[in-house]
């Protein structure tokens, strides 16, 4: 990996997001793809974990204020629709994030800079980095800029996604909450296959696969719903 001009990278991110990073090492971590991971170099996966939670929390608060008459189920479905992968990817593409992600030459040649999973992960990592670098005002400004209009135009309640439907199903029957476990990740970096197992106490487990961990969880939830609703 060639040395990275951190100041130039920070300027490009400022132009794309409106946020000026102070900790350039944190920014570098947020934009580093796992294909460049070494023992001495961090990638965006930990910050992605944080950013996913920050995005969900901020959008939840946004919806709570925008729709005072919605019940929990409606708010949950709206939040799921707003933070799903396709929405995050669309926003990542709109700010040109793909070209700023640091990855191996082979990964870029295989289309890694426009890979939906990579774009989703990197944008969530960037939001996590904003949180760590500048606190609430840093990430809220960015999230509101890109998600508020989308939320305001949600005049309907989206249909339930499988994970939400499964959760509400088991809660309504007093069952233990579903547990999701990543079983494996296979395939090349530019086209990974994730396998996730969902289990419900006394009702066994079901395996789902997908091109991202989130999609695999949704597939597993869908299959589990089918299994338990067919019980006598």
UniProtKB/Swiss-Prot annotation:
UniProt keyword RNA-binding present: yes
Active-site residues, as the UniProt record annotates them: 52, 124
Gene Ontology MF annotations: double-stranded RNA binding; metal ion binding; ribonuclease III activity; rRNA binding
Residue ranges annotated for the DRBM domain, each copy included: 161-230
Record flagged with keyword rRNA processing: yes
Keyword terms, alphabetized: Cytoplasm, Endonuclease, Hydrolase, Magnesium, Metal-binding, mRNA processing, Nuclease, RNA-binding, rRNA processing, rRNA-binding, tRNA processing
Entries under Gene3D superfamilies matching the protein: 3.30.160.20, Ribonuclease III domain
Subcellular location: Cytoplasm
Biological role: Digests double-stranded RNA. Involved in the processing of primary rRNA transcript to yield the immediate precursors to the large and small rRNAs (23S and 16S). Processes some mRNAs, and tRNAs when they are encoded in the rRNA operon. Processes pre-crRNA and tracrRNA of type II CRISPR loci if present in the organism.
Subunit details: Homodimer.
Protein name: Ribonuclease 3
Protein's organism: Anaplasma marginale (strain Florida)
Organism lineage: Bacteria, Pseudomonadati, Pseudomonadota, Alphaproteobacteria, Rickettsiales
This protein's encoding gene: rnc
């Amino acid at each position: 990996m060639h040395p990275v001009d951190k100041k130039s990278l920070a300027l490009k991110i400022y132009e794309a997001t409106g946020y000026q990073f102070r900790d350039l090492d944190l920014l570098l971590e947020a934009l580093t793809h796992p294909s460049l991971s070494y023992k001495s170099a961090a990638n965006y996966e930990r910050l992605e974990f944080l950013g996913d939670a920050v995005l969900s929390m901020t959008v939840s608060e946004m919806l709570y204020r925008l729709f005072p008459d919605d019940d929990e189920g409606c708010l949950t479905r709206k939040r799921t629709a707003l933070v799903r992968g396709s929405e995050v990817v669309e926003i990542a593409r709109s700010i040109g994030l793909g070209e700023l992600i640091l990855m191996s030459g082979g990964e870029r040649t295989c289309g890694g800079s426009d890979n939906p999973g990579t774009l989703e992960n990197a944008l969530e990592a960037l939001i996590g980095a904003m949180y760590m670098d500048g606190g609430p005002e840093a990430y809220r400004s960015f999230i509101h800029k890109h998600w508020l209009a989308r939320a305001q135009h949600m005049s309907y309640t989206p249909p339930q996604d499988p994970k939400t439907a499964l959760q509400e199903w088991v809660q309504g029957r007093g069952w233990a909450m579903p547990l999701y476990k990543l079983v494996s990740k296979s395939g090349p970096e530019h086209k990974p296959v994730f396998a996730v197992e969902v289990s419900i106490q006394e009702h066994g487990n079901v395996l789902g696969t997908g091109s991202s961990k989130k999609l695999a969880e949704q597939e597993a939830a869908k299959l589990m719903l089918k299994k338990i609703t067919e019980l006598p």
